[in-house]
């Protein structure tokens, strides 16, 4: 009888090769809005070859979702009860869970989408921390965030815009989806469907970028191409559009340029463009149709960096889909770091402003200018003019000007709601000058 030879497990060859490519992309939903969007993506099954993750302070919200990978943020900070709409609590909860986040991302992840609804507590406060952890690990980090509908109120909108500025500093590229822009386009939609449309729009953004990487094309685009465009790209624009029939490529380009994803940004100011053209089997892309693409690209500056590709999608039939990913905008098109004052360029310290307490912010004229800029950028000039109100500024009289009728008239001639700090300062200076003149 032959002796049975048992080989150590380490000497055996494993012929069970993996049948699926390991996912290098994670889509992470932070907070209630981000979690709803990621749950929507997961259930729709629209995005292939990615991993979905939920991060929330609200344990009940995590339990309700069917997304399998979940992290409860700040078990000690919030005890699973949520952030109560306070971003600082969301931030502290995420800081408590940094170790869990690092472990989550230490599996070969190359790219992370951080999705959140700005304006609440967890999404606004925790999403920048989650993004920072990913970016510090060398992962290509893309934020996709929504900002509120106007009917959600001034306080939430301003809180959301502060959150946008905070996460912008912690991602390679940031896509901002303005829910109010969706309302303008789909004006006849009911409230539940309006929020669902916001989830759909966010899904389209993540899906379009992911498929550039995961779907093999004829002129193939891959992670390296997306990385070139998005790495340290700042504010990004992602948009796509479908075209059908005669001049379908031009129609797709037109629809791309009128997508709600553009959020009123001018795509032609970009320095880097990734252009992907996808077509179906019924009517493949013709060489003649590339003339329409050439005409479109001719509208950009000649020094723009362009990466382009083509791919087949059988579901498109005779449609053509154009996807544009654009970055490299000038800082003046993104954040008001400077403004002209008295003929000189003045630097606005937005970073310091963001970190001040709520009460201090509301009393700061620089903060008010900054908020007005952001409201104008995302919601339009008419909105910004009506949404931020200057708080009444008192004029403090002293013994020297209590009986100065000219100063008294200057103060009472301006209603309290029109009294800015600068106006009160000018009156005070005038009073001091008059007092000095009398003393002489």
Describe each region flagged by the PLM.
Residues 1-440:
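Tubulin/FtsZ superfamily GTPase core signature
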């Amino acid at each position: 009888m032959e002796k049975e030879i048992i080989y150590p497990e380490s000497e055996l060859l494993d012929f069970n090769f993996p049948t699926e490519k390991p996912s290098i992309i994670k889509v992470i939903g932070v907070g209630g809005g981000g979690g709803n969007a990621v749950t929507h993506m997961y259930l729709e099954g629209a995005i292939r070859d990615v991993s979905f993750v939920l991060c929330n302070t609200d344990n009940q919200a995590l339990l309700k979702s069917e997304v399998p990978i979940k992290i409860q943020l700040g078990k000690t900070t919030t005890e699973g009860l949520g952030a109560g709409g306070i971003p600082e609590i969301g931030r502290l909860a995420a800081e408590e869970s940094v170790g869990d986040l690092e472990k989550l991302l230490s599996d070969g992840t190359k790219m992370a989408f951080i999705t959140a609804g700005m304006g609440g507590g967890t999404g606004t406060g925790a999403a920048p921390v989650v993004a920072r952890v990913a970016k510090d690990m060398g992962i290509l980090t893309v934020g996709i965030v929504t900002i509120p509908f106007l009917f959600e109120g001034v306080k939430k909108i301003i809180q959301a815009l502060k959150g946008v500025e905070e996460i912008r500093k912690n991602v390679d590229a940031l896509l901002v989806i303005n829910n109010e822009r969706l309302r303008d386009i789909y004006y006849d939609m009911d409230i539940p469907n309006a929020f669902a449309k916001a989830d759909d729009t966010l899904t389209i953004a993540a899906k379009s970028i992911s498929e550039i990487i995961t779907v093999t094309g004829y002129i193939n685009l891959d992670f390296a191409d997306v990385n070139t465009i998005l790495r340290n790209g700042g504010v990004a624009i992602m948009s796509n559009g479908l075209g059908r029939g005669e001049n379908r490529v031009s129609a797709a380009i037109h629809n791309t340029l009128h997508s709600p994803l553009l959020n009123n940004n001018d795509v032609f100011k970009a320095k880097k463009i990734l252009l992907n053209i996808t077509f179906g089997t019924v009517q493949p892309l013709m060489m003649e149709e590339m003339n329409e693409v050439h005409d479109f690209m001719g509208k950009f500056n000649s020094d723009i960096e362009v990466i382009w590709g083509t791919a087949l999608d059988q579901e498109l039939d005779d449609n053509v889909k154009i996807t544009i990913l654009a970055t490299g905008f000038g800082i003046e098109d993104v954040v008001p770091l400077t403004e002209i004052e008295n003929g000189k360029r003045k630097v606005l310290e937005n970073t310091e402003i963001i970190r001040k307490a709520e009460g201090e912010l509301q009393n700061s004229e620089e903060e008010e200018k900054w908020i007005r800029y952001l409201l104008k950028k995302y919601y339009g000039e008419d909105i910004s003019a009506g949404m931020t109100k200057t708080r009444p500024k008192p004029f403090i009289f002293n013994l020297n000007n209590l009986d100065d009728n000219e100063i008294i008239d200057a103060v009472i001639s301006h209603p309290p709601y029109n009294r800015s700090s600068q106006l009160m300062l000018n009156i005070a200076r005038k009073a001091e000058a008059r007092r000095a003149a009398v003393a002489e």
